[in-house]
Amino acid sequence: MTDIKRPFSNPLALAILVLLYERPMHPYEMATTLRERGKEKSIKLNYGSLYTVIEQLLRANFIAVREVLKEGKRPEKTVYELRAAGEVELIDWMRELISSPVKEYPMYEAALSLLPVLPPEEVIDLLEIRIGLLDKTVEEIDEQDRICREMKLPRLFSLESEYYKGVTLAELKFTKDLLSDIRRDAGGLRTGWTEMRKHLLSIKAEARTKETAMAAIRKTQKKKGKP
């Protein structure tokens, strides 16, 4: 895992640097190009965040204003270009991202770390729903891959899809295995979970009892005129 701290961690900043590495562009052209290439499937994109990141890259001296275009009564278009420092950052950042795994924080992982909030019986049903959705996702990826093959697109353009499929299949296998383990109480998983949930609910009930008692005391004191 890498501990390097960079000025930016937003994938959109990386995408903007790559676009300007190709040629100078204005923001609308950047957004259009990213969408035409299907990059919104891998990079969260909206105009508001695009302009914000551009301003941040300007302040970091990674990009610069090349020119401002004015065509008739249309709004001005600011064209940006990549600076030398921006190119250095881009290449170094790409090398780091490809070579060094980074700890990420997926929501599914977060939910798994907090499972005692829900009973095992309910989670079994929820995992079945997730498995169905993951199966559907794999089917959609396969269909996209089929279209790419029919169009005879270079494999380079489908690498992100291959990665996404690999991650999805890994999650699907994990989820199926987890569902099986819960059902058969493998390693005492379901038993321990049930006990942990009972303990959690006991703590919650005790806290509410104390809160109710304190509220009653405050109410009594208020009636007696005590602070």
Walk through the language-model features, giving the residues of each:
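Short, contiguous alpha-helical
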Residues: K165-D185
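Non-transmembrane amphipathic alpha-helical segments
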Residues: L127, L134-C148, T168, T175
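Long amphipathic alpha-helical coiled-coil segments
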Residues: I182-R197, G225
